[in-house]
């Protein structure tokens, strides 16, 4: 699979009741999320764009409102197509599988574990990112 390019959020997990998680399409959030503040948080996360670059990096980008653009530039924000880059990490292909660096380091039974998590592709061409909690589709 070729990851290069921009990906947008298609689905995020929603918890309609304690202990139950379902993935919900962005346009259906209001059906499942009734708290206005929580809905705003979800909509903000759903506006992120993820760009997988040929140099092996993936940039998480958030839209910058036009009235905030100059201030963001003055503060040194990296701006691409009216989006501010809020995180950059690396991705790689290894043994035919795709991985990205979660930047989470740790150990299991005193042995270090990799900070890389697999990016899984679904039959419909979407991918699971952010430890599987974000479903992305090509922009």
Please tell me what each predicted stretch does.
Residues 1-139:
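Lipid interaction determinants
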């Amino acid at each position: 699979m070729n990851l290069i390019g921009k990906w947008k959020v298609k689905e995020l997990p929603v918890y309609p009741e304690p202990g139950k998680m379902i993935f919900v399409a962005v346009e259906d959030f209001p059906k499942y999320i009734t708290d206005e503040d929580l809905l705003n948080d979800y909509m903000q996360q759903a506006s992120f764009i993820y760009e997988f670059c040929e140099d092996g990096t993936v940039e998480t980008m958030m839209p910058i409102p036009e009235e905030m653009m100059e201030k963001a530039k003055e503060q040194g924000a990296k701006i691409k197509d009216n989006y501010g880059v809020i995180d950059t990490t690396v991705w790689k292909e290894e043994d035919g599988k795709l991985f990205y660096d979660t930047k989470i380091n740790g150990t299991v039974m005193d042995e270090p574990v990799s900070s890389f998590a697999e990016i899984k592709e679904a039959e419909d061409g979407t991918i699971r990112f952010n430890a599987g909690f974000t479903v992305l589709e090509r922009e």
